[in-house]
């Protein structure tokens, strides 16, 4: 069975969005920079992204992924569209960097 890694939603201001979610919801910030932030909830991660830097999407862990784009946090991923045009990210973690 596949596992959903995170859902990414578009916001217009990362700091404002992080402040709102951490103040109004029970979550913690696990990563934040100028273009995106990642919040950990009990059962899922929520990515807050800027529209000019990242698309809104849903990410699934895919340990069989090969030849994806490598990211500075040790993950590898590719983006694709489902049959309805929604953006899907397939993401693979390094063995020692699993979230």
Give a label for each model feature:
Residues 2-4, 66-67:
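A short, structure-level motif marking secondary-structure boundaries and short turns
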Residues 16-19, 65-69:
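Short, conserved charged micro-motifs
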């Amino acid at each position: 069975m596949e596992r959903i890694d995170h859902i990414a939603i578009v916001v217009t201001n990362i700091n404002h969005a992080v402040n709102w979610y951490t103040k109004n919801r029970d979550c913690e910030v696990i990563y934040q920079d100028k273009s995106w932030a990642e919040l950990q909830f009990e059962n899922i991660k929520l990515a807050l992204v800027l529209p000019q830097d990242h698309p809104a999407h849903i990410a699934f862990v895919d340990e069989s992924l090969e030849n994806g784009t490598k990211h500075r946090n040790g993950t590898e991923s590719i983006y694709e569209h489902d049959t309805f045009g929604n953006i899907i990210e397939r993401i693979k973690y390094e063995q020692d960097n699993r979230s």
